[in-house]
């Protein structure tokens, strides 16, 4: 289907390539270079190294990259013993991260109930470094189907 461009001219839109089934494709977390370090219902840690592609216009780690790291830790911890989907998230940013720095998202449960659970995720500079950002997230959850 031709689409008109501002200033004249056209370009043709083609159908997107067929999606590869998830197990064979790279996940979003893999594309960003994330690694799961620990995964238990009491503590989950996910890490990545900030690359040039993850920088914002100021030369520091993009907020979306930091949010994505926290969100991955949130997704992992909340789905270990239940089927869970995010109902609400909030993130506060305290410090900037630079290219080459290793960031670790440390997720712990604040409260886990039958249908709702809230988790705290601290994004740290390195394994034990300062907290760069704090993510709080609540999921709607149900028991995993066998």
Curated annotation (Swiss-Prot):
The keyword Hydrolase applies. It comes from the Bacteria. InterPro entries: Acyl-CoA_thioesterase_PaaI, HotDog_dom_sf, PaaD, PAAI_dom, Thioestr_dom. CDD domains: PaaI_thioesterase (cd03443). The lineage of its organism: Bacteria, Thermotogati, Deinococcota, Deinococci, Deinococcales. This is Putative esterase DR_2321. GO terms for molecular function: acyl-CoA hydrolase activity. Keywords: Hydrolase. It is an enzyme of class 3 (hydrolase). Its EC number is 3.1.2.-. Coiled coil: none annotated. Belongs to the thioesterase PaaI family.
